[in-house]
Every structure is written in structure tokens, then in C-alpha cells.
Amino acid sequence: MESHSSLSSSSSSSPPSSLSSESCCVKVAVNVRPLIGDEVTQGCRECVSVSPVTPQVQMGTHPFTFDHVYGSNGSPSSLMFEECVAPLVDGLFHGYNATVLAYGQTGSGKTYTMGTGIKDGTKNGLIPQVMSALFNKIDSVKHQMGFQLHVSFIEILKEEVLDLLDSSVPFNRLANGTPGKVVLSKSPVQIRESPNGVITLSGATEVPIATKEEMASCLEQGSLTRATGSTNMNNESSRSHAIFTITLEQMRKISSISVVKDTVDEDMGEEYCCAKLHLVDLAGSERAKRTGSGGVRLKEGIHINRGLLALGNVISALGDEKRRKEGAHVPYRDSKLTRLLQDSLGGNSKTVMIACISPADINAEETLNTLKYANRARNIQNKPVANKDLICSEMQKMRQELQYLQATLCARGATSSEEVQVMREKIMKLESANEELSRELHIYRSKRVTLDYCNIDAQEDGVIFSKDDGLKRGFESMDSDYEMSEATSGGISEDIGAAEEWEHALRQNSMGKELNELSKRLEEKESEMRVCGIGTETIRQHFEKKMMELEKEKRTVQDERDMLLAEVEELAASSDRQAQVARDNHAHKLKALETQILNLKKKQENQVEVLKQKQKSEDAAKRLKTEIQCIKAQKVQLQQKMKQEAEQFRQWKASQEKELLQLKKEGRKTEHERLKLEALNRRQKMVLQRKTEEAAMATKRLKELLEARKSSPHDISVIANGQPPSRQTNEKSLRKWLDNELEVMAKVHQVRFQYEKQIQVRAALAVELTSLRQEMEFPSNSHQEKNGQFRFLSPNTRLERIASLESMLDVSSNALTAMGSQLSEAEEREHSLHAKPRWNHIQSMTDAKYLLQYVFDSTAEARSKIWEKDRDIKEKKEQLNDLLCLLQLTEVQNREILKEKKTREQTVSIALASTSSSYSGSSRSSSKHYGDNNASDDPSSPSSTYHRATKHLKYTGPGIVNISVRESEALLEETRKMKAMKKMGQSGKLWKWKRSHHQWLLQFKWKWQKPWKLSEWIKQNDETTMHVMSKSHHDDEDDHSWNRHSMFQGA
């Protein structure tokens, strides 16, 4: 970036059209990139709207107007180079410096837009297009001037300027395995300022360039060396500011022509100019919480934000018209980035700023800040001038003055105008007389030429000679007259004679040429005529020959016809009588044969009729047999079909019933899921509404505090600068101001916390919406997933859920946009306070001590309250633990009750088992023996259950043996009653036991055995059993209550 030492920006040595120092504003273009995959997955919505008619961007309630807007509904990004950068490339050839600046948050597409990340020969970005346009322009004008190109590529990493084209620094070299630390082989590049105020770089490498491929190689080398890293927002995030500079030097040849006394003097000179094009790719602003950076990445992000803050302060200072008119200080020296861009912002350069933004509402705060900075940059006034050599400009000016003086001298050295007028009149008279004589001479000579041609054609006539002599005499007289006129015309006659001789020679040559051409044409016509005559004779001979051949063939055919006629007549005369005799004999024979043929035909017809009748009877018999067999086969098939259809109907009915049961079951599940989703939807809406209201309240409170903050410092400054107030009033105002500042910071933190929570809520809603849409589009895949929680929902329920989620996403997006706008305004005002120190209005040590004491007291009080809150939290936790213990005890009690309920059900099954034994006709002892034997074999049988239940009732506690004995006697008594009922004819035969839902039921083998009587027996058995077990149940409850009391005391 080191400038040529002989260049100057003076406009006095240049033409006004090319070197005038006219102010021009910085051109600003906005490039809106599309939503990326991660943003779509998180459910982000576009918070930026672009007008398709005017270059205007609307974000919430903030409208912004720029020079160009690309992406979204604006112009396509492919037009960015033609509309923004191509005029800057053309200005390089006129000596104007230019700068293209890409600004925006991390992940907004700055590197992609500029093309500094070029790899593998890709052509994306503005820099490759600049290369192509630059070399195309050079190729078109290289015959008029000479060019020299140099490029340099630097980066600003952690406030250090590094050379990316230094071949001694290896690519991707790391120090101690720590990424992002490049080992330098020499000291960093130093920034210097020349005596004429031009910023230069000491130690930066400038590579001479001859072709576009060499420039692309330098760009690729620097891009590979540039520091990049991975963050949560960008896999290849630029960790430094990069500046790619193209220096164009051109020497133009200048010629000046002067005319002095009929002599031409051409003086050649050279015009030298030099211009630079800076292509700047800034690193993006980032938040550590969003990027998830730490360690080295965190330090890099801090330096990046610090440099961008300094750039924002410079833009604010240059964009404020009031401060610019007052000549306020511009903080260029706060950062090395702003120091290098000093000429680009408010200096000798034509600058285009490209603000790259993300339309996602999750980045609303950063996007609004970018738009605000870009809007301020439009007010920056630059003063570009053409950088041309002063010496060459002075020489050009002197050449112009010399030409003017030469023209003036020629005008003064001429004769007087009257003499010139007289001489012009004489010349005009002589020229008119000369023209008249020349016209007459031309007429006579044309006549003479015509007569000469006539003399050639009529040489045989004798009259020619007399005419020729007369004409000759006339010509001689004309010549004599002409000679006399020549004598009177003075010196002009000699010139006229020479001209006439030259004219005569020309005419003779032209007429000779015409005659030769006519002769050639005549010869050509004659040759064509001869050729035509020869061709006609040949054709006539050919046709005559053909006619003779045809006549000959005609005669031959006639002779053959005559011979044939004669032979036919001779044959007819010689064989008339023999033919008549043979004809009669043949006629008799023919009649006899015809009679025989008729008789044979009649016999044949009779035989054919007989054969037909026989064939018909055989066919009828075969047809009847076939029909019989077909009927039998159809009968068998019909029977089989009836059986199959009956079986199919039975299976179909069973499947339909099974499917109906399954559908009912799924319907119940679907209804249950629907109710759960409705409850979830209501809860989510309530939570979202509550969070939105909290965010709105926090945002409103923050806005009020920010409005109050505007007037608070002003009031304090008035108190400080005016009359000394009372101590009590001053302390009160300071206390109020400090409370307001602390409350603003707390509210900012609260709004930011709500903002992050809202992002998480919106992400969860987006994930659920995405899964629902995927299950709607691909239902076969969703059924196979383990977490297909929505697969039981009906399509209508899913559509309702999708609509509800979309509405909640809209509400969440609007809340995010509002909070992002308020956070942006809060940060902007915080930066303005940083630019103007917060504590400037504290004028005395007494105020500072009072504020310090107040802060100390507030901090001590806050910590005491925190300790009290922690103590309350601990107490609440202890209460919660007690409640959890009670809950566990309640669950244990519920389990005990369930066990008792199961025991009672087993007792009922025991009664059923004893009933079954009485119906089988077995005795009491055999039944007991059967139960004891089978208890060991089948633990799930009713008898084994009876055995375990009896044993359980028998040994559950002291004093229960008699109760179990009485219960056994009651059960046996019931068994005897059931045995008596067996004697009645209405009892059925027991077939088998069937276990269903952990209960033993009885089934009968035949329907006519009336199984409904079993319910009456079971009812009677239950009443008896419950009456016997009531007392035992009360005793058990007393035992359990004692156990619970002891467990609670132990806990």
C-alpha cells in the first residue's frame, strides 16, 4: 500500500474535467443472503423486507434507503459488479483511487461476496470479476499506453498487520499445536505516514503482475495463508481483516502538432498516473455466547469487535454533518484498521460499502446494527482526485499555449485584405476565360475524333478526303484562333495547353480501351454464333438418322405381318374337311361321357346324404356326453367354491372384527393422544403468551429507562456546570442517576435472557413442526421411527397442530424482532456512552466518595438479600424433600392396597376351584390330595393358588389361625351347597379352565348347558367370603397403619 512519492493531488496542473476535486458520497449497497439450513431447521423467519421498486429495506418500524439492494426481493446479486464495482475499475485508468468495503456480522456472506476465499480456481466473488475486467481493459488500450501492475495482500490479526504474500511464512503453520497462532519468520508490517499525508506500509510485499493467472495465484496464496477458524455460526469464520490492493501505473504518449511557416513540428511527451484499488474483506462482528468461542477464538473475537467498534466510531464521526462542519476530531488512530482506511473514508478515494446482512430473525439485533452503520456511511463525503504527475501536466499545458501562439503569429504575418481581394478577382476572371476556351476545344476535338472513326469505316468513298481536308482546315483555323487566344491569356496559356494535351491523351486511351472491349465482345458473339451453327447441324443429322431407322423398322414389321397372314390362310384352306370329321366323332363321345357323369353324380349325392345323417347322430351323442361331463365338473366346482366362499367369509368376518377391535383400540389411543396434544398446545400457548408478555414488559421498561437516561446525564451536567447546588440535592441526583444506570443494565440483561429463552422456545417449536411435516410427507418412514409420537394422530389433528405451531412461531418471531431492535438501541447508546466517558460529570472527590459509599451499601444490601433468598431456597428444598418422602410412603401404601386386592381376587379363584372339584364328583380328601399334588407341578393352577392363599392367610400374623379355620369351614360348607346343586339337571359339564387378564373363569362345553347360572353361584360365594374376611381385613389395616407410622418416624 506504499504510494509513489512523485504523485500529487493538485488540480491546477490538470484539465478541469479530469482532475477537479469534487466531493462525492460513499455509495452503499446491501446484500441480503438467503436463509441457510441451520436457520431453517431452527424455524427462523425473515425479519427484513425489501421493496421491489425502490432500493429500500424495512426492518420492523425502521426503514432504510440505500443506493442498491441485492437479494430477497431486490436486484439479483449478479448485477452487483456491473452497478457498483465496474465504474471504480474504469476510474482506475483515469487515476482515481477506489475502495470496496464488505461489512457485516459473522456468517453474513462477506468473504463469499468479495471472493477472498477463492480456492481451486473458482470464479465466485467480486475480486475475480475485477481481475477479468481489469485485464480486458488493459488489452483494449495497451497500444496507446504502457501499464505496470502490482498487488499486495495483508491481514490485520489481533491488531497486528501481517503480510499474506510473504513466501517465508509457511501455509497453515501452527505453534505448539494451538490453532490460530501463525509462527512469523519476521517482524510484522509497520504503518507509516509520508510527509504529504499518504499512509504507507513498511515491509509489505508488492508482487509485479503480468497476467490474470498470476494475480489469481497471489489471491489464492493469500487466502490459504489467512487465519480462519470454526465457530458455532460458521465453519470457516475469518479471524482477521483482509485487504487486497491492486496498484495500476500507466504511461500515456502525448503528441502536440504546431505549424510555423508551412512546416510541421510534432513533439512527443509522456503522461504518468498511478491509482490503487483496495478490496477489503472485514471480519464479522460476533457474540461469544452465539459463536461458542473460548480461549484463542475468544481473544480473536475481542480484537475483531474492538476494531469494528473503532470503525463504527469513525463512520459516526464522518457521517454526522454537524460534527463535520464543526471540524470535530475523527478517531482514525484508535485502530490499525481505521488507520489503513483513512483515505477510503473521507479522503482521496471513491468508496463503495457493501453491507452483508442475514434476514433471519435470530440475527435481528446484529442486522439492525449493520443497517444503521451502513445508513450513516452514506453521509460520508470523500474528495477523490486524479493522481497524475505534475511535470507531465505542466508540459501538456505549455504545449497547448505554444499551439495557440503559433496560430496567432500566422494570422498576424499575412498581407492586407484589399490586395488579397484584387488578386482573387483577377484570378477568377482568368479562370473563367480559361474554362470557356477549354469547353470549346473539347467540343471540336470530340467532333474530330468522331470523324476519324467515320474515316476508318468509309475509306472506299472518295468524299472522305474532301471532308477531311475541310475539317482539317477548320481545325487549323480553330487552332489558330486558339493560339491567338492563348497569346492574349499570357502565362496561363501554357498551363492550359499542357492540361489539354493531358486530357487528350487520357481520352485517346479511354476510347482505345472501349474499342478493344467492343472488338472482344464482337469476337465472342461470332464464336458463339459459330458454335450455335455447329450444334444445330449435329442435331439435325441425328434426327434424320433416327427417322431412317424408324422407317426401316416399320417396313420390317409390315413384311412380317404379311407373311403371317399368308400362312394363316394356307393353314385354313388345307384342314377344313379333316377337322369336320374329327369334330363329329368327338361330339358323340362327349355326349356319352356326359350321360355317365350325370348318373354317377346322382349316386354320389345319395351316398353323401346317408353319411351326413350318420355323422349327425354320432355328433349328437358325443355332444350329450360332453355336456354331462361338464355339468358334473361344474357341480363339483360349485360345491368347492361354496365351501371356499364360506371359509373366506368366515375369515373375512373374523378379520373385520379383529380390525374393528384394533381400530377401536387405535381410536382410543388417538383420542388420548389428541387430548394430550390439546393440553400440550394449551400449555405451550400459555407459556409462550406468558413469556411474550414478560418480554414485552421488559422491553417496554427498557425503552422507558433508555428514554429517561437521555435526560439524566443532561440534568446532572447542568447541576455540575451551573451554580453549586445543595449537598442533599446533589447526592439525591447522583443516587437517582446511578440507580437508573444500574436498572438499565439489569433490564438489558433481563431482555437478553428473555431473548435467548425465546430463541430456545422457537427452536423447539420448529423441530416439532419439522417432524410433523416429515410425517405428513413420508408416513411410511415415520411409522418405523422409534420416536414417532404423532403417528397415531389423524390427518386433521396433525393439520390443526401444524397451524397452531405456525401461529406460535409467528408470535415468537415478532417478539424476537422487537427485542432485537430494543437490544440494538441499548447497545448503540451504550457505545455512545463509551465514546463519551460515563463519569465525566463527576466534578469532585466528594461526589466520587459518596457514589462509592452508595455502591458499597447497595452491594452489601444486595448480598444480604441474596443470602436470605438462598436460605429460603434451602428451606423450600427441605420441605420439598419431606413432601417427596410422603409421596413415596403413599406409593408404598398404594402398592400394599393393590396386593390386598389381588389377594381377594385369588380367594375368589380359590372358591371357583373348590366349586369345580365338587362338580367333578371327587370327595373332600381327594380334592385336597389333588390340590396338594398339582401345586408343585403347576404353580399357575387354581389349586396351587388356593394352597398358597390358604397358607398366606394362615401365617400372616398371630391370632389368625382360628380365622383361617373358620374360613376353610365356610368354604367347605359352600362346596357342599354347590354339590347339592349339582344334583339338579340344569348344571353343565366343566370343560376347561381359561386364564384371561389374571383371573380364572369357567367355560362350558355346550351352549345348552346354560352357563348364566354360574354368575349366581359366584355371587353367593363372594358374599360369604367377604363376610368371613372382613375382620381379617380390619386387622391387616391396623398392622399396616402401625408399620407406616414407624416408617415415617424413621424417616
Swiss-Prot record:
Signal peptide: none annotated. ATP binds at residues 104-111. The keyword Nucleotide-binding applies. GO terms for molecular function: ATP binding; microtubule binding; microtubule motor activity. Residues 25-380 form the Kinesin motor domain. Keywords: ATP-binding, Cell wall biogenesis/degradation, Coiled coil, Microtubule, Motor protein, Nucleotide-binding. Residues 414-448, 540-644 form a coiled coil. Disruption phenotype: No visible phenotype. One of its GO terms (biological process) is cell wall organization. Residues 1-21, 916-946, 1029-1051 are annotated as: Disordered. One of its GO terms (cellular component) is microtubule. Pfam families: Kinesin. The keyword ATP-binding applies. Residues 916-925 have a biased composition (Low complexity). Homodimer. Belongs to the TRAFAC class myosin-kinesin ATPase superfamily. Kinesin family. KIN-4 subfamily. Kinesin-like motor protein involved in the control of the oriented deposition of cellulose microfibrils. Composed of an N-terminal domain which is responsible for the motor activity of kinesin (it hydrolyzes ATP and binds microtubule) and a central to C-terminal alpha-helical coiled coil domain that mediates the heavy chain dimerization. This is Kinesin-like protein KIN-4B. It comes from Arabidopsis thaliana (Mouse-ear cress). The lineage of its organism: Eukaryota, Viridiplantae, Streptophyta, Embryophyta, Tracheophyta.
